[in-house]
Design a protein with these regions (language model features):
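C-terminal accessory segments enriched in acidic
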Residues: 1-16, 160, 196-451
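Short glycine- and acidic-rich boundary segments immediately preceding or forming the N-terminal edge
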Residues: 1-51
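Short beta-strand-to-loop junctions in surface cap/lid or active-site-entrance loops
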Residues: 52-60
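Active-site/substrate-binding loop(s) of hydrolase catalytic cores
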Residues: 60-62, 75, 87-199, 203, ...
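Short glycine-rich or small-residue beta-strand-to-loop segments that form or flank ligand, phosphate
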Residues: 64-69
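Catalytic metal-binding/acid-base residues of hydrolase active sites
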Residues: 70, 108, 182, 219, ...
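Di-metal (Zn2+ and/or Mg2+/Mn2+) metal-binding site signature of metallo-dependent hydrolases
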Residues: 70-78
Length: 451
């Protein structure tokens, strides 16, 4: 398998496809390759739309790939758009890999429609934040699988999650590929098991597309690295144990997340892969030069900035909560963020102060993660607040308090967005590069599992 040739063939996509455009494309593919492609409904979304499983027939082993595990993550939808077409066109590749491929292009289609406002550009942090939606924890398809761990017990999956469970149980995939993406930074990976034979390939693939590995702070402080930018897949059990180790009496009451698709697929021995891709990058995301700042101080500074920002959002929300009329997904997402216990942050603060690995000079990448990448994610929360208030006004809420809070949230969103963009030497990464890394990494993993 010539991965570099596959990488070179990926089209220069200029925009993300909407849910309807993705569905239409799947049906055209079936019409074009009726002997290879089948589509069947395996459930319905919460709003009643069909959830379609696209299958490209092949060998006895199964790979199950699903996009949009969080609805603000359409990169994987485009990866499936390309990969499903390529597998149909390329018989030798299909035969060499020896898999039957099952795809769901967008598993949270209802939520993805709420993000489509930025899918056609302009691709800037500010525009992304303005149209951003990521569900409350209880409404996240990827994190509402059943679990029974210590005091964390749950068995009421969302309809979309039940659809994933059904496909995992039917296909027992050798490879389960959940196509997540981050927002800002570099490329990094999660795998369910150590796989040293893949590490060099995983490190090389981003270079083919002029992308950098993310060598700054891990997504969560307790992530276990197998190699630079390659981590063991995190589970809700890990989150629970982290909180428990650092003084939280009952993590099950505050964690919010349930089990993930990776945890559910353990029963079938599936190899699980995530390739986290950013929309935006910056030269400092993998700069390993050492600074004069201590890593511990940088992490604590980022925490203090986050607390100030969270308190501002909380105060804006509390000033109008009695005036709000609509129960929307955006409102539930914002209020879930506000309700999230400070136990997470306090547990991390305790880890920072105790862990010897934080008591050293920070690299430029680590400093960038703490002081700039963190600001990008705070901007998204401001965007949720501004959007919730816009929705209220558009829905006929004439409250003066809501109008005032909406104006203030919009001003802060615009000002913080401009300030962040001015402080960064960022670029919007070409969509073909994002698709390329996910596609090539997935094919490399599939070949590795059958080697």
């Amino acid at each position: 398998m010539d991965l570099k040739k596959i990488a070179a063939d990926i089209p220069d996509y200029q925009q993300f496809l909407t849910v309807d455009e993705l569905n239409d494309s799947s049906h055209r593919l079936r019409e074009q390759y009726p002997d290879l492609v089948s589509i069947r409904n395996i459930g319905r979304t919460r709003s009643g739309d069909p959830i379609e499983l696209l299958t490209v027939a092949g060998g006895a082993d199964c790979a199950f790939v699903f996009g949009g595990p969080h609805p603000n993550e359409p990169i994987g939808c485009m990866t499936i758009e390309y990969l499903s077409q390529r597998l149909c066109e390329d018989g030798p590749l299909r035969a060499e890999l020896g898999y039957t491929w099952h795809f769901i292009k967008s598993i949270d289609a209802d939520g993805m429609r709420l993000n489509e406002g930025w899918f056609k550009g302009p691709f800037t942090p500010s525009n992304y934040a303005r149209h951003f939606y990521r569900p409350a924890r209880r409404e996240q398809v990827e994190w509402t699988f059943p679990i029974d761990y210590k005091t964390l017990s749950f068995n009421d999956p969302l309809p979309e999650t039940r659809a994933l469970m059904r496909v995992i149980d039917e296909t027992k995939p050798k490879l389960l590929y959940s196509l997540h993406n981050a927002g800002f930074g570099g490329v990094y990976y999660y795998v369910s098991d150590e796989c040293p034979a893949l590490y060099d390939t995983f490190h090389q693939i981003p270079e083919w597309f002029n992308l950098a590995l993310d060598l700054g702070e891990p997504e969560l402080s307790f992530a276990e690295p197998y190699a630079p930018a390659i981590y063991r897949m995190l589970t809700s059990n890990d989150m629970y144990d982290h909180l428990e180790r650092h003084g939280v009496a009952d993590p099950g009451s505050v964690i919010g997340f349930k089990a993930s698709s990776a945890q559910y697929a353990e029963r079938h021995g599936s190899f699980f892969l995530i390739v986290e891709m950013p929309y935006f990058d910056e030269p400092r995301v993998n700069d390993q030069s050492v600074t004069s700042s201590k890593r511990r101080d940088a992490i604590l500074q980022a925490m203090d900035i986050a607390i100030e920002h969270d308190n501002w959002i909380r105060s804006q929300h509390s000033s109008v909560v009695c005036e709000l009329k609509l129960d929307t997904p955006v409102r539930r997402a914002l209020e879930d963020f506000l309700a999230m216990s400070a136990d997470f942050r306090e547990a991390d603060r305790e880890w920072v102060l105790q862990a010897e690995e934080t008591n050293r000079p920070a690299t430029q990448a680590e400093l960038f993660s703490n002081l700039y990448t963190s600001r990008f994610y705070k901007l998204l929360n401001t965007g949720l607040l501004a959007r919730m208030l816009r929705d209220e006004i558009a829905g006929g809420n004439g409250s003066a308090a809501v109008a005032s809070a909406s104006a203030m949230a919009t001003v802060r969103l615009d000002e913080d967005g401009r300030a962040l963009e001015a402080a960064l030497d960022y670029r919007a990464i070409p969509i073909r590069s994002l698709v390329g890394v996910q596609c090539c990494a997935g094919l490399a993993a599939a070949a590795y599992l059958n080697s």
